[in-house]
C-alpha cells in the first residue's frame, strides 16, 4: 500500500436499504466525524437507487461524504466498519440488503491491491450511485486511474436529476448534514462545492 503522508482527501460512499434509511446514513456520517481524526468538507444530496446485483431487495438511499484525514486508509476502513456495526450491519449475503454500507472510494493518490481494501475502489467507475452524488459534491473530481468523475458519470448513464437514468434519482426532499469545524463554510454541509483547484 502506498500513498502520501499527512492529511489527505478521502471520498466515502454511503448506502442503506433497510430500516430508517436516511437515519442510517446520517448516523454513519455522525460516527465517522465524531472525533477530530476525520473532518467533513462536504456531503452530497441523497440519491435513491435500484439495487445492483444480489437478491431481490428494497431500493437504496445513497450519498457521498468528502472528508480530510491524516489517518491511514486502513484506520479509516476500521472507522467505517465500526459505524456499520453500530447500525446492525450483517454480511451474510454478498450484495445483500444492509442497514448501512460505507465504502472508501479514493484516498488522494493512495493505491492498494489488498483484497480487503482496494484503492481506488475497483468498481466505483461504473456505479452511478457513487458517481452522481460524488460529482454533485465535487464537480471537478477525478477518480485516480479512470479520469474525471463527470465523464464516468456520463458513461454510466445517470444524469443525477430527478427521474434520471441508470436507476439513480436525486431526492431533493431528503437532506444530510455533516459537522464542520470552526472556520469552514456552512454551505458545504449539503450540495455541491466549488471545483477544487487542480493545477500544478
Model-predicted segments: where are they?
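N-terminal beta1-alpha1 ligand-phosphate binding loop
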Residues: 2-38, 44-48
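Flexible, gly/pro- and Lys/Arg-enriched active-site loops
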Residues: 37, 51-61, 71-183, 191-200
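Short, structured patches in soluble enzyme cores that scaffold and shape functional sites
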Residues: 14-16, 69, 135
Amino acid at each position: 500500500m502506498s500513498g502520501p503522508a499527512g492529511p489527505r482527501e478521502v471520498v466515502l460512499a454511503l448506502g442503506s436499504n433497510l430500516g430508517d434509511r436516511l437515519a442510517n446514513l446520517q448516523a454513519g456520517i455522525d460516527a465517522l466525524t465524531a472525533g477530530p481524526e476525520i473532518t467533513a468538507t462536504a456531503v452530497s444530496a441523497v440519491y435513491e437507487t435500484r439495487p445492483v446485483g444480489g437478491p431481490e431487495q428494497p431500493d437504496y438511499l445513497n450519498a457521498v461524504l468528502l472528508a480530510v484525514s491524516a489517518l491511514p486508509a486502513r484506520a479509516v476502513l476500521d472507522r467505517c466498519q465500526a459505524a456499520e456495526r453500530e447500525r446492525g450491519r450483517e454480511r451474510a449475503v454478498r450484495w445483500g440488503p444492509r442497514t448501512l454500507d460505507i465504502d472508501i472510494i479514493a484516498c488522494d493518490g493512495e493505491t492498494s491491491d489488498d483484497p480487503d481494501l482496494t484503492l481506488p475502489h475497483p468498481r466505483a467507475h461504473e456505479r452511478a450511485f457513487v458517481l452522481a452524488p460524488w460529482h454533485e459534491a465535487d464537480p471537478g473530481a477525478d477518480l485516480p486511474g479512470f479520469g474525471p468523475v463527470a465523464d464516468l458519470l456520463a458513461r454510466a448513464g445517470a444524469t443525477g436529476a430527478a427521474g434520471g437514468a441508470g436507476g439513480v434519482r436525486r431526492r431533493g426532499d431528503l437532506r444530510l448534514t455533516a459537522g464542520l469545524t470552526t472556520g469552514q463554510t456552512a454551505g458545504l454541509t449539503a450540495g455541491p462545492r466549488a471545483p477544487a483547484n487542480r493545477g500544478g
